[in-house]
Amino acid sequence: MPASSRKYPYVGFEPEREAGKDILFVEGITKTVDGVKVLDNVSFIANKGDKIALVGENEAGQTALFKILTGEMEPDAGSFKWGVSTSQSYFPQDNSAFFEGFDEDLICWLRQYSEDTTETYLRGFLGRMLFSGDEVYKPAKVLSGGEKVRCMLSRMMMTHANVLLLDQPTNHLDLESIQTLADGLARFPGNLLFSSHDHQFIDEIANRIIELPLGQPGCLDRTGTYEEFLEWKHNR
């Protein structure tokens, strides 16, 4: 049988430096969005090595928390503090702002986020996400949803951050790409905070689960797998 010629993406996140013991402190964060209190006195401490999945139906609360932790949004109350040795890279659920109005090609798009601006270097990261040959000269503004996600992952890999924040990263990805992303995040030696509705994706990566229940203060926080979290929640 001939070998398959199909190519698969490669996702590998390599931190430039290891984070210290202190990762993230969240204290009493509260936020109302469009008249709905989506975060109510949320507190937790992220420890070194934590790969935290944000789960549940409160997607607006999850996105608000990501935006607060990355400085895009101010909390109504509460505070947070990143450890001094941490560096963060963020994958937003809505990436349109990264591409709207950008008339140049993918090489130029990625060059905005890189200290090394050589085409060979940038091609390497785009190539991991299956942009090869003349595809790297495609205008960034005409990309499909899946292609934009692949570009955002190329950008994240290039940052060499030791803390990754990903808000619904599996949207627009096919099954092979989702599995490749799961493998890359499972291998990642740093800290993760991510949201997903994909149970298998969560199970392959997370070692801690946090749910932000809508209409209730605080959060449900449990170390372990998603299955263990669901069993614990059921028996509370």
Label the model's feature ranges:
Residues E16-R236:
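ABC ATP-binding cassette signature C-motif
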Residues M1-I23:
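Coiled-coil termination/hinge junctions
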